[in-house]
A protein has these predicted regions:
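N-terminal type II signal-anchor transmembrane helix
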Residues: 2-42, 46
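Cleft-lining beta-strand/loop regions that shape enzyme active-site pockets
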Residues: 40, 49-171, 300-424, 464
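Extracellular/periplasmic catalytic domains that process cell-envelope and extracellular macromolecules
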Residues: 42-45, 301-306, 427, 523, ...
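Charged, glycine-interspersed solvent-exposed loop segments at helix/strand-loop junctions
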Residues: 175-274, 422-502, 506-508, 512-517, ...
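C-terminal long alpha-helix characteristic of the crotonase
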Residues: 230-231, 261-305, 415, 471-477, ...
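Acidic/histidine-enriched alpha-helical segments
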Residues: 241, 353-358, 386, 412, ...
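Intrinsic disorder and flexible/low-complexity segments
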Residues: 300, 304-309, 313-340, 344-345, ...
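Short glycine/threonine-rich loop-to-helix capping motif typified by GTGT followed
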Residues: 361-365, 498-501, 543-545
Length: 589
């Protein structure tokens, strides 16, 4: 027996030691890969920069040290962010070693505003006398085609297809599904256009929501058509006819209607690139990825100096507390903005907003620090794909607001949402709860019972108060009357183009324009761009990332298919309380 215990304990000890050693080796290996990825590189003459469409493009390059790691080849290939893509395109325009840009097109889950910014950068790149070629082997989606029209020539595979059909918005409604699993969503709201709650309480779009979606989708489409018309020299009326009839779907029809310039295979593309680069042998063709080119030093980049422009990236849903890299923690970002305000070397702040909104109190906490910052130094707002509801709330104090023509903005409104999980827990899962209160409403708000009339009235009052505050703060920031803001508010969503017309933004432009404006307002000509927030060190983040993956793996294993209910409940829990949030479920494609 003693011998058995001895060997058992030895085995367990060995497993523990081996696991610890494996973890140490794994972390060391990952750290080595991350460190090696930061070394500067050089490129040869006649190089071609490759813009590979096919992965999501965040406003800021992925700060996750595990992102893009190829364990087999021990390399780091993170997806570049919009900031890196724009900088690389501008840098390549002045780089004598770069002959042109190849857009490897296909799927582009980037958002219309992001795509438009990249497209404008490509058009400016061409002004340097360099070429831009777009090629797609498979289906060229509509968003990708819009990007491709910035190129000198558009080529697609003879067997591929092109998507050109106009915009569509599909909204999924959860009401019946929630009823089936026993979840009741209790809603209060202000704003007849506040459509964020509709998927939980309706089976289809309200007339007001349908109208606003049609308006802002129409505004975006008109911009797309106008830009393509200018680049391809095709009248807008003809483009709309092509979209109505799906005439450009087949490759042969796309060529016939001048939507593309040629139907070629990849070997012919290589020949084209060789000719444009002035080389004879394919082995001398030097294609450079965005990730690699980002490590090429920029001779024009200021590396030192006393003047800084802080660019604060605020992407994702606004939540309370610290948040994480996929959302905006109100308290954390307030602290980041406060430090930028107090830093005398920071001459101006640019807030890059790409958010559908979120928690009302978290938005207000951020607003306060942004308002203080705007009183201390220039605060310029740059709006990405979304800057709506809470996203617009935090933009309101801006000295100057820039939006893309295709930005989804506005949505000045508020709503409250509390799920009642009583039936789900009791009837579906067999769980019951009992409550002991010291006072009448001690357990409010509770997800285990429905609200009583008094609580509903209290929630509505809270929503009304938040809406009034929202309107007043926008009125103050935009130098408008509260009545004027209310007229364009009520939860209504606007495109960037429309927002400019009604005074919600000052200029149409992208992130680069906002940074330039901030420097001008601050009276500085040379400056360093300081990107914020600065996240925790790679070693801490690697461990955190690994633990997060383990947690989700365990949940999936234990819950199986029921993990979808867990995810749904987590989403509902995050929306508990008063929200200033866009109906982000809406996808325009």
């Amino acid at each position: 027996m003693k011998s058995f215990l001895k060997y058992t304990l030895a085995t367990i000890t060995g497993i523990i030691i081996a696991s610890i050693l494996f973890l140490i080796v794994l972390i060391a290996s990952l750290s080595a890969i991350v460190s090696s990825g930061n070394k500067p590189v050089s490129i040869s003459n006649n190089s071609i920069l490759v813009l590979k469409a096919g992965v999501p493009i965040p406003d800021r390059g992925d700060q996750n040290p595990l992102s893009g790691i190829d364990i087999v080849n021990m390399t780091l290939n993170p997806a570049p962010g919009l900031n890196e893509i724009l900088h690389n395109i501008e840098k390549a325009g002045a780089d004598n070693k770069i002959k042109g840009i190849l857009i490897e097109n296909g799927l582009l889950p980037a958002g219309w505003a992001t795509t438009e910014e990249i497209r404008e950068a490509l058009l400016k790149f061409r002004e340097n006398g360099k070429f831009v070629i777009s090629y797609s082997d498979y289906v060229l989606t509509q968003e990708c085609y819009y990007l491709a029209t910035a190129a000198d020539k558009i080529y697609i595979n003879p067997s591929s297809m092109l998507e050109f059909k106009g915009l569509s918005s599909e909204v999924m409604f959860y009401k019946k599904a929630l009823e089936k699993i026993g979840v009741e969503v209790q809603v209060t709201r202000h704003g007849k256009f506040k459509g964020a709650v509709e998927p939980f309480i309706l089976d289809k779009l309200s007339d007001e929501n349908r109208s606003q979606i049609k308006d802002y989708a129409g505004s975006i489409w008109n911009q797309v058509v106008a830009d393509i018309s200018k680049s391809r020299n095709i009248p807008a009326e003809q483009l709309n006819r092509l979209a109505d009839n799906l005439d450009g779907t087949l490759a042969s029809k796309a060529l016939e209607t001048n939507l593309v310039d040629g139907l070629i295979y990849h070997d012919a593309l290589v020949d084209t690139l060789k000719t444009l680069s002035g080389i004879k042998k394919e082995k001398d063709l030097n294609l450079i990825s965005m990730t690699k080119y980002d490590k090429v030093p920029d001779p024009k980049m200021t590396v030192s100096g006393k003047n800084k422009i802080a660019v604060v990236y605020a992407s994702g849903t606004i939540v309370d507390g610290k948040g994480n890299e996929t959302n905006i923690g109100g308290n954390y970002y307030a602290d980041v903005i406060s430090k930028a305000r107090l830093d005398t070397s920071v001459r101006a702040i640019v807030l890059r907003v790409n958010s559908p909104g979120g928690n009302a109190i978290a938005s207000d906490i951020m607003w306060r620090e942004l308002d203080l910052a705007a009183k201390a130094k220039p605060l310029v707002i740059s709006m990405g794909n979304y800057a709506a509801s809470g996203g617009y709330f935090i933009s309101a104090p801006g000295t100057k607001i820039y939006a893309d023509p295709m930005t989804i903005s506005g949505s000045i409104g508020a709503f409250g949402l509390i799920p009642n999980l009583n039936k789900l827990l009791e009837q579906k899962l067999g769980l019951t709860t009992d409550i002991v209160n010291t006072n009448k409403n001690s357990d409010f708000p509770s997800v285990f019972r429905p609200m009583n009339p008094y609580e509903k009235e209290l929630m509505q009052m809270s929503v009304e108060n938040i809406y009034t505050e929202f309107v007043n703060k926008v009125a103050s920031g935009r130098k408008m009357s509260p009545e004027a803001v209310d007229n364009i508010g009520q939860g209504r969503v606007w495109s960037g183009t429309s927002a400019l017309k009604i005074g919600l933004v000052d200029e149409i432009g992208g992130l680069k324009d906002a940074i330039t404006a901030a420097a001008k307002l601050a009276g500085v000509e040379t400056f360093i761009v300081k990107e914020l927030p600065v996240f925790e060190d790679p070693y801490t983040r690697i461990i955190s990332q690994l633990s997060g993956e383990v947690k989700m793996s365990i949940l999936k294993k234990e819950l199986g298919e029921s993990v979808k209910y867990y995810n749904m409940i987590q989403e509902l829990k995050s929306m508990t309380g008063i929200q200033t949030r866009l109906p982000y479920f809406i996808d325009i494609h």
